[in-house]
Amino acid sequence: MIEFSHVSKLFGAQKAVNDLNLNFQEGSFSVLIGTSGSGKSTTLKMINRLVEHDSGEIRFAGEEIRSLPVLELRRRMGYAIQSIGLFPHWSVAQNIATVPQLQKWSRARIDDRIDELMALLGLESNLRERYPHQLSGGQQQRVGVARALAADPQVLLMDEPFGALDPVTRGALQQEMTRIHRLLGRTIVLVTHDIDEALRLAEHLVLMDHGEVVQQGNPLTMLTRPANDFVRQFFGRSELGVRLLSLRSVADYVRREERADGEALAEEMTLRDALSLFVARGCEVLPVVNMQGQPCGTLHFQDLLVEA
């Protein structure tokens, strides 16, 4: 879907990206992570030509991106950023409709798409005519993601999209993005500096340093088979057990024949999130519900200790 072949980028005399070779598979959720100044945001911005590469080739769906008109390329890619960038004097509906209007969609088609995306992102219909300043930070970011998805792009690019949000809202939106990716099957490339966010979201994880890829692969491989000491130290030896819990879901450890009382865990939660709730509630067993909110079993604290 998106292929970097020997790509480099300089800002003045400084090489921000050096001889980069990467392949983002169609339908994958890829996450770029690394040290400050590692080149991860530059790499993302080269995909939709917000930053032009100096050498090498970047191919999108088999075509070198420089052979495509910039507007055509960007209309095939949604883009969501930390600052959100909503138009302050436009309503939620108008913001979501930005790209479909540019593409001359019919009014009826646009209205249907707004309704569809607001439902998908968990935005209540009564927010449709509100303005950005009337929304919470989490709601604003959901509108930003809805706008990025509005024209049904082939690729969704996300640059630190949840960085300014509080931890609770951030966690909820991470869970939403996992669900949306599962439902839509879109190719997503996301940049973050947050290790836990990267581990929670990524199918394909790319660790960068000084403009180069240090290691890439699935998160489990990165944690358990680090390529060198830099990778090992970046992910943290002392936190390895807890971070491994981030890669497992409650659904994989549910005892489905059992039932219990109390506030339930969602089966799509990570074991790391479940561990926090066990500690907060001081109990040994918690009930579990499925995505429809129906009881589906229990999770035992002891099972988490075995996994960690």
UniProtKB/Swiss-Prot annotation:
Keyword DNA damage applies: no
UniProtKB keywords: Amino-acid transport, ATP-binding, Nucleotide-binding, Translocase, Transport
GO cellular component, as recorded: ATP-binding cassette (ABC) transporter complex, substrate-binding subunit-containing; membrane
Induction section of the entry: Expression is sigma S-dependent. Induced by both osmotic shock and entry into stationary phase.
EC code: 7.4.2.-
KW Isomerase (keyword) present: no
Catalytic activity: glycine betaine(out) + ATP + H2O = glycine betaine(in) + ADP + phosphate + H(+)
ABC transporter domain ranges (all copies): 2-235
InterPro entries according to UniProt: AAA+_ATPase, ABC_transporter-like_ATP-bd, ABC_transporter-like_CS, CBS_dom, CBS_dom_sf, P-loop_NTPase
Gene Ontology terms for molecular function: ABC-type glycine betaine transporter activity; ATP binding; ATP hydrolysis activity
Family named by the database record: Belongs to the ABC transporter superfamily.
Official protein name in the record: Glycine betaine uptake system ATP-binding protein YehX
Organism this protein belongs to: Escherichia coli (strain K12)
